[in-house]
């Protein structure tokens, strides 16, 4: 599954475009975010991407989960959003 990493500085429109492209190509995607600002941008991106794929008859579901990732040798807890068609 393709992993899209989102930061608090990410543009929701850019992430939404990437998300819609991955969904059309692979059928599902995972978004990773660390922190409240990044999660905010990620959720906005899912809402925008839903608007991008809706005209083709696709509705999206989003499954939130925790995941542990390594950053500079340090383990951090991130939120992952698994996005799939309904």
Swiss-Prot record:
Gene Ontology biological process: division septum assembly; sporulation resulting in formation of a cellular spore
Function (record text): Interferes with sporulation at an early stage. Seems to play a positive role in allowing cells to progress beyond stage V of sporulation.
One annotated GO molecular function: nucleic acid binding
Species this chain originates from: Bacillus subtilis (strain 168)
InterPro entries in the cross-refs: Alba-like_dom_sf, SpoVS
Cell division is among the record's keywords: yes
Keywords: Cell cycle, Cell division, Septation, Sporulation
Protein name: Stage V sporulation protein S
Transmembrane segments: none
Signals that turn on the gene: Induced early in sporulation under the control of sigma-H.
């Amino acid at each position: 599954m393709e992993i899209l990493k989102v930061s608090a500085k990410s543009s929701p429109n850019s992430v939404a475009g990437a998300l819609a492209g991955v969904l059309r190509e692979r059928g599902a995607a995972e978004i990773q975010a660390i922190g409240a600002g990044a999660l905010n941008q990620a959720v906005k991106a899912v809402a925008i991407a839903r608007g991008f794929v809706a005209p083709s008859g696709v509705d999206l579901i989003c499954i939130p989960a925790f995941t542990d990732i390594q950053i500079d040798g340090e383990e951090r807890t991130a939120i992952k959003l698994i996005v799939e068609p309904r």
